[in-house]
Amino acid sequence: MPKWLKTLLKTAGVLACLTILLWMGAVAYVHANKKEVLEKITAQLNENINGTLTIERMEPVLLRGFPGVSVALKNVVLRDSLWQVHKHDLLQASDVYLAVDVLSLLKGAPRIKDISVEGGRVYIYTDTTGYSNTTIFRRKKDTTGRPSSLKINKVKLENVSLVFENKSKFKLFEMDIAQLVARLDYNNNGWDAKVTTNTLVRNLMFNTEKGSFVEKKRVNANLNLSYYEETQLLEIPLQTIKLDKDKVKLGGKFMMGSKPASFVLNIEAADISFKSALSMLTPKISEKLSIVDISEPLDVEASIKGKMKFRDTPLVVVKWRVVNNTLTTPAGPVTDCSFRGIFHNEVRGGKGHNDRNSGITVYDFKGSWERLPFKVDTLLVTNLTSPVLEGRFTSQFELAKLNRIIGGKSFVFNKGNANLNLHYRGGISQADTNKAYVYGAINVNKADMSYLPRDLTFTNSSATVRFKGRDVYVQNVKLQGGSTVLHMDGSLLNFLSLYYTDPRKMVLDWNIRSEEVDLINFIGFLGRRKQVAARQEEKPGNSVSRMSAQLDKVMDASTVHLNLKVGKVNYYSFAAQNLHADVSMRENIIVLNEVSVNHAGGKLAVNGDIAQGGSVNKFAVKAKVDGVDVQEFFRSFQNFGQDAIEDKNLRGSVFATADVKGSLTEKGKMVPNTLYGFVTFDLKNGMLKDFEPIQKIGKFIFRNRDLRNVSINKLANRLDIAGDKIIIPPMYIESSALNLHVDGVYALNKGTNINIDVPLRNPKKDELILDDGERMERGMKGIVVRLKAVDGDDGNVKIKLASKEDKQQRLKKGAAAESADEAP
């Protein structure tokens, strides 16, 4: 072995022995002078406090702190002078270990280097007057001029609870420190510290009325801190810590020298879950933001700035960035979304840091909702007490994508495109009380669609739906159904108020124009709305299902008001011109307020209603006929469901009024034997052509007269209709071939019983008599043949001579009528 190495080893051994001897001497000194050492340590600790420090006993610890000497202080209690008032010990610890410098101990002036507290609580308390138990640390007046000898190099806490409670400023911080080790390095400016900690943050309330940040979060960190004594600034550079399982960067400043003291905390987290990010905020803020969720991790930055003063709520700014994520909202999930966002609890400067003045701003938002792509340049959510959302939404999509949203129960789109540009301001969820306002338009082009409840199909259609506040206007509508092209515009006032709350009050006003309409293309409106099963490839979300169900409810309950102007109208064999109609449709009722049309050289006017019952639809109408060609009129309406007299038998112009009730099939055909009511008519320039009942009279009389073409000079009466019966009051008919007096009942099935009185007098003899009463009286003079029309065995009406009993009954009936007329 080299000589120099032997010398080195001997020297090291001697130094080690001296160190051990010195350490043993120090330990022996402590054992021998416990009371004196305890007094000196207590005195050193008391240098910077104004209060009471109580130590039950002191014991030396042999190996702890080697090569220094450590002592254990048992049951240490530190109290301020007003402890009897507030009852909060500043420090209460079962074990406090102090590492003492050996040389200072041997000199009789022990200097504390390290402090370790195990199993205790630190409670920093400030009452409502502003008094704090930390006043115990106010330095006593220095009479020696010497600086304090207490400079701790290391502080260690194990299983210590730390509470900071400020009653006057409504602040409460609570932490359970499993372990904290702080190594301090003193310099001319103050000190630097390296802190390692494992701590559970139970509460971090900057305002106890607002709730806690990072509540019940475990913090694992290796932190570097710097304290500048002159400015009383504690600086925490931005560095990584762990909050539960999330890695975040934490930095900040605590400015204790300012009045009041202030602080800034900065937090950054990359790839953190949205729920984890929310959990770092106060429950109130978290609850407001939890109306949405983000499936994949995102990048978050948060800044908290506040003052340690009465009821101060710190300024909170949270920024985040989302890329290709899924955003869940009250209206359903938004997929493939990317955006930048910021939360700010002071939207308007000087209005305070509170929910009402808080807001969320989202930039460059893009995503897909129910497969509809859309963009929002800037989206605002303000007043988190009662949230208001505002933003301009733009989208271009194929109309077929709407089928999934509306459920395929009302409308089904087969082709076409839509361009959406809407500015929305209002509540976020249906329960919100804020009124919603929408401005902008939706343009629809080249649309093919079906309206299933009415079995209607439209092709190559277009429209512009314009939103103005709470109202909706539908403009430039072109609907092509079959051979019919409709041009429409409409309005739906107060749409946003009534859509969910009271759809029965909704009225959709339509103005409809068309050159020609074939009503067969719209026959589906006659029947009741059909219940259609939803056609969905996939089941949509609950919010979309509710929207679809509500759309069907609105379509069922709302009122549609139509104002129509049509150049030409066709309906089976009916043809008319210049249709003007005012029609209302509500639930299962079609109300014809005022309908007029030119038809067969005259004019028709109708009002009434149709009750949609499905296969059979009941109607009640009042109609007026002015100067209509009677043959065309009967032909157009399929002889009104009867065969007593048909269009082929009639000529002339008719003036009539009708008040009838009946039933139509869902195809618009008259249901036989369902017509009830009355018709008053006046036939001018009339003719009966090949009318079989008249021709049958010729078998009895007037065989030489032309009964195939009978011109009617005057024909006016009222007919009462009762199902399959037409009741004919007494009616005098003047014609070119004969005069007739008719009354009775004509039955469409069985029960025909018509009295026919035929005077043999030639009508031409009375042509020069202008007075109608005189002409009728003279026409019935002379021989009168009394006939009767009854049911034949073959089902047809037959004409026969009246029996003696029939004649007597008719004479009595006539006498009674004359007596009634002569009565005063």
What do these predicted ranges mean?
Residues M1-T52, A823:
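N-terminal type II signal-anchor transmembrane helix
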Residues L45, L98-A99:
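N-terminal cofactor/phosphate-binding cores enriched in small/glycine residues
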Residues N46-S70:
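Short extracytoplasmic
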Residues G68-L90, K113-T129, I152-F164, K171-R183, ...:
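Small-residue helix/turn framework positions
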Residues A93:
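Phosphate/ribose-recognition catalytic cores of enzymes acting on nucleotide-derived substrates
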Residues L105-A109, F310-P314, G350-N354, Q430-K435, ...:
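Short loop/turn motifs that connect adjacent beta-strands in outer-membrane beta-barrel proteins
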Residues T135-T143, F525-K553, P824:
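Intrinsically disordered, low-complexity segments enriched in small/polar residues
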Residues Y572:
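Conserved ATP-binding TGD loop and adjacent catalytic N/P-domain core of P-type ATPases
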